[in-house]
Curated annotation (Swiss-Prot):
Listed GO MF terms: ATP binding; double-stranded RNA binding; L-threonylcarbamoyladenylate synthase; nucleotidyltransferase activity; tRNA binding
Gene name per UniProt: tsaC
Keywords, sorted A to Z: ATP-binding, Cytoplasm, Nucleotide-binding, Nucleotidyltransferase, Transferase, tRNA processing
Name of protein: Threonylcarbamoyl-AMP synthase
Class of the enzyme per the UniProt entry, highest EC level: transferase
InterPro entries in the cross-refs: DHBP_synth_RibB-like_a/b_dom (IPR017945), Sua5-like_dom (IPR006070), TC-AMP_synthase (IPR023535), TC-AMP_synthase_SUA5 (IPR050156)
Provenance organism: Pseudomonas aeruginosa (strain ATCC 15692 / DSM 22644 / CIP 104116 / JCM 14847 / LMG 12228 / 1C / PRS 101 / PAO1)
Length: 185
């Protein structure tokens, strides 16, 4: 896979501990390396989001999430594989394989395999990323690059330009264990 220069630049920022904005399937997102504590706390501060709530981790393909999925029952893995890639976020038992600054106070973590080509490209370069809507708490999610810039001014380390994926609503969130819909699409 030949990566675009802009995706390579954004990936370098992520690897160096930066926080970026990028287009997703429905809204602009903020992202960083989920294993970089300083970057995650900076992202949370930008959003004014409590760490206890937890965050979504997005990946380019299901194999990038193997570390979370390897011990899950086959029926659950089939459920995931049948909905990915796509706008389906699942709450998956994290089994303490991700840090608390990602999972919050929960026994599960929200994960998604994206079908957005630019986000896939970025995740191929960085590995899984934090993916949370680009907006301060209580404000509407950004649907344009201009809105991202208005919300965060020069507080981001990079903005990866590109088009949204065409969906009107953020991803559906379901609990993998119970099947319960947590957030409808």
């Amino acid at each position: 896979m030949i990566s675009s220069f802009r995706a390579q630049c954004a990936a370098r920022v992520v690897r160096e501990g930066g926080v970026i904005a990028y287009p997703t399937e429905a809204v602009w997102g903020l992202g960083c390396d989920p294993w970089n504590e300083d970057a995650v706390y900076r992202l949370l501060a930008l959003k004014a989001r409590p760490v206890e709530k937890g965050l979504i981790v997005v990946a380019a393909n299901i194999h990038q999430l193997d570390f979370l999925l390897e011990d899950l029952p086959d029926v659950w893995l089939d459920r995931l594989a049948g909905t990915w890639p796509g706008p389906n976020t699942w709450l998956v038992p994290h089994q303490e394989r991700l840090p608390e600054w990602v999972t919050g106070v929960h026994d599960s973590v929200a994960v998604r395999v994206t079908d957005h080509p630019l986000v896939q490209e970025l995740c191929h370069l960085t590995g899984p990323l934090i993916s949370t809507s680009a907006n301060p708490a209580g404000r509407p999610a950004a649907r344009t690059r201009l809105r991202v810039e208005q919300y965060f001014h020069d507080e981001l380390d990079a903005i990866l330009g590109g088009a949204l994926g065409g969906r009107r609503n953020p991803s559906l969130i379901r609990d993998l264990v119970t099947g319960q819909v947590i957030r409808p699409a």
